[in-house]
């Protein structure tokens, strides 16, 4: 299970709408395993395939387990997830994203959701969620639709964040390339922000 590099804003691939999975086969299960390993290593609590530049509607989450936590891992792998129902009541959570490291903003989303998806065995399932799990599901499904959490904040704050990442990308492009044996990409530096 290799670690996959996580793409960072302003990478335009983050804005693409992912294609559905035709069936959950060994290739999709291997992708899910790679995504879980990448998410745990980052560390994060959710990851969408689009964040590792894979054009498939696949997300993985584990809100119970965080790096250096004593909690037992309880991962959820979802192919073709879709929100079937969302409550009118909203709740807020300070969200972060592995593709937008070190930035956190309060985002309002439906407090409860019901999501339909295919599990690792290709069976159709539904999950009802509230709290952090509901927030995480919505955040990751947004990624599959080319939507980032910063799209849910004010235009001024969003523009400031995008400008900062565009400037950093230009500076990175001007710097000499890292040695190929470097153990970390920018997205996987120790202490990187957790993804919701």
From Swiss-Prot:
NCBIfam families linked to this entry: pept_deformyl, PRK00150.1-3
Residues annotated to bind Fe cation: 97, 139, 143
Organism this protein belongs to: Methylocella silvestris (strain DSM 15510 / CIP 108128 / LMG 27833 / NCIMB 13906 / BL2)
Gene name of the encoded protein: def
Protein name, entry field: Peptide deformylase
Domain of life: Bacteria
Compositional bias ranges of the Basic and acidic residues kind: 171-187
Cofactor binding description: Binds 1 Fe(2+) ion.
One GO process term, biological-process aspect: translation
Catalysed reaction, written as an equation: N-terminal N-formyl-L-methionyl-[peptide] + H2O = N-terminal L-methionyl-[peptide] + formate
Active site: 140
Family designation: Belongs to the polypeptide deformylase family.
Stored Pfam families: Pep_deformylase
Keywords: Hydrolase, Iron, Metal-binding, Protein biosynthesis
């Amino acid at each position: 299970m290799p670690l996959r590099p996580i793409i960072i804003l302003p990478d335009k691939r983050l804005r693409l709408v992912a294609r559905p999975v035709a069936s959950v086969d060994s290739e999709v299960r291997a992708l899910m395993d790679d995504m879980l390993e990448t998410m745990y290593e980052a560390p994060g609590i959710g990851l969408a395939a689009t964040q590792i530049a894979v054009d498939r509607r696949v997300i993985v989450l584990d809100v119970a387990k965080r790096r250096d936590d004593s909690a037992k891992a309880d991962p959820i792998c979802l192919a073709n997830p879709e929100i079937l129902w969302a409550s009118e009541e909203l709740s807020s959570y300070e969200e972060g994203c592995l593709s937008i490291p070190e930035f956190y903003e309060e985002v309002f989303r439906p407090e409860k959701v019901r999501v339909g998806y295919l599990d690792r065995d290709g069976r159709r399932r539904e999950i009802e969620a509230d709290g952090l799990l509901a927030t995480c599901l919505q955040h990751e499904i947004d990624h599959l639709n080319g939507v980032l959490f910063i799209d849910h904040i004010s235009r001024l704050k969003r523009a400031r964040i995008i400008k900062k990442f565009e400037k950093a990308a230009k500076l990175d492009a001007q710097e000499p390339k890292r040695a190929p044996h470097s153990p970390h990409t920018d997205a996987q530096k120790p202490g990187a922000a957790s993804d919701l």
